[in-house]
Amino acid sequence: MLGRKRLTGVMGLLLRNGEVRTDIELTDLYIDCGFTSRAEALELVAPGDFVTYSYAVDELENDCIAGRGLDNRLGAYTVLHALLRAREKGAKVGVFAATTTGEETTMRGAFHAAGRVRPTLAVAVDVIHTSDFSGMPPQRFGRIKLGGGPALAKGSVCSAPLNRALEEAAGRLGIPLQYAVTPGVMGTDADKLNQTGVGLPVTTLFIPLRYMHSPSEVGSLADVEQTVEVLAEFLAALDEHFDPDPFRD
């Protein structure tokens, strides 16, 4: 809790033996910080103070990590390091990167970033649900697994030349790609980027993630590293002759 000072608390909700509740109201939830009185609480917190889950990241086995906000801290990390590595590889074109606000709601951040930069093409880097744990059927999000490498979006919005260039980059590195079928929309900032200007060629490179949108998301550092490598190789290979227009493909 971010009040007059940082406070640690736990969410309080008492369930009876075997009880499962689906009608939880906002008034049923509270945060227990250990205060002994209302007066003591009001000395340190006020209505409207922000609350967030603990931002610590825990290391798991097999190069996995767990924490909140890996969607999309992993994407931001990947883009930053891919740009640094692309420069080391001798990238020949100008590359802009943006971490954006509102991806889950209005996608306003991506829209304004593209309006300012006016790029030739765009690749979003985001996370995608996996289907490799109990209770998650592959029919829901596809056969995506942790540790299986980056997943490339395949759908009507995705630029075929962009996808092919990313596949070729992965092939040169010997990195296997998974595929995420994204009919209609990708569910990433690429959807809004595609609608900017006169229409922007886009695609998305996904990082597999378990338990998305929970306080304990799980990702693979190996997947992150491979996504960095593929994106950097793709960027380093771009030149002024690359044409992302599928109608001239």
Model-derived segments and spans:
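N-terminal hydrophobic/helix-forming segments and targeting peptides
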Residues: 1-249
